[in-house]
């Protein structure tokens, strides 16, 4: 079963513009009820092109700890919904402490804790 925090290889093509594409690792960020019953999953792209977080929506993951080819960064500003058929092989899963970092970066990316544009 697909679980929140799992890292899979996924085919993200086709893409447009600045979207992350190709076959690459992604982390499942959807809740486990959705993962069980929905034909789709919500994921965040992972890149190995940078190995240090550049902005607050980035989370670093270490290659040795997570059995990746290289030190990588989860891009929580690059989230998308995929059909489960796009998921290839499961690579690993993230620790609870790493998922707390993911949740904090998601909060920033989605503006969940500072919704104030209706204030006058």
Curated annotation (Swiss-Prot):
Keywords carried by this UniProt record: Endonuclease, Hydrolase, Nuclease, RNA-binding, Toxin-antitoxin system
EC number: 3.1.-.-
GO MF annotations in UniProt: DNA binding; RNA binding; RNA endonuclease activity
Protein origin, superkingdom: Bacteria
InterPro entries per UniProt: PemK-like, Plasmid_toxin/cell-grow_inhib
Top-level EC class: hydrolase
Pfam families referenced in this protein's UniProt entry, alphabetically: PemK_toxin
BP-aspect Gene Ontology terms: mRNA catabolic process; rRNA catabolic process
Role noted for this protein: Toxic component of a type II toxin-antitoxin (TA) system. Ribosome-independent, sequence-specific endoribonuclease that cleaves mRNA, thus inhibiting protein synthesis and inducing bacterial stasis. It cuts between the first and nucleotides of 5'-UACAU-3' in single-stranded RNA. Neutralized by coexpression with cognate antitoxin MazE.
Family designation: Belongs to the PemK/MazF family.
Assembly information from the UniProt record: Forms a complex with MazE which is no longer active as an endoribonuclease.
Protein name: Endoribonuclease MazF
């Amino acid at each position: 079963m697909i679980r929140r925090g799992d890292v899979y290889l996924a085919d993200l093509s086709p893409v447009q513009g600045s979207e992350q594409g190709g076959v690459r690792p992604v982390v499942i960020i959807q809740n486990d009820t959705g993962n069980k019953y929905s034909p789709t999953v919500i994921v965040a792209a992972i890149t190995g092109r940078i190995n240090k977080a550049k902005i607050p929506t980035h989370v670093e993951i270490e290659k040795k700890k997570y059995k990746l080819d290289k030190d990588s960064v989860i891009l929580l500003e690059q989230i998308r919904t995929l059909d489960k058929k796009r998921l290839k092989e499961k690579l690993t899963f993230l620790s609870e402490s790493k998922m707390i970092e993911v949740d904090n970066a998601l909060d920033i990316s989605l503006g969940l804790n500072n919704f104030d544009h209706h204030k006058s």
